[in-house]
């Protein structure tokens, strides 16, 4: 049986932490900032955990 391949799109978008949680970046933080409030762009900083409903699906894409 061939080796299972990691979904390349998912590997670029999600990271697994040391404890096994899956984190992602928030959307709407790439461009067109001139009409977005500074408070919104600060809120969209950093990483956040993948919701519990999506964790199993993302895990399968990452060969978890």
From Swiss-Prot:
Mind telling me which InterPro entries this protein's record contains?
Answer: Ribosomal_bL35, Ribosomal_bL35-like, Ribosomal_bL35_CS, Ribosomal_bL35_sf
What SUPFAM superfamilies does the annotation carry? L35p-like
Keyword Protein biosynthesis appears in the UniProt entry: no
Q: Point out the gene that encodes the protein.
A: rpmI
Superkingdom of the organism of origin: Bacteria
The region called Disordered is annotated at 1-22, 34-64
Q: Which GO terms describe its biological process?
A: translation
Q: Name one GO cellular component term.
A: cytosolic large ribosomal subunit
**So what family is this one in?**
Belongs to the bacterial ribosomal protein bL35 family.
Pfam families per record: Ribosomal_L35p
Q: Where is the composition biased (Polar residues)?
A: 50-64
* Protein name as it appears in the record: Large ribosomal subunit protein bL35
HAMAP family associated with the record: Ribosomal_bL35
Transferase: present as a keyword of the record?
Answer: no
- Basic and acidic residues composition-biased segments: 34-48
Question: Any idea which UniProt keywords this protein has?
Answer: Ribonucleoprotein, Ribosomal protein
The UniProt GO MF terms for this protein read:
structural constituent of ribosome
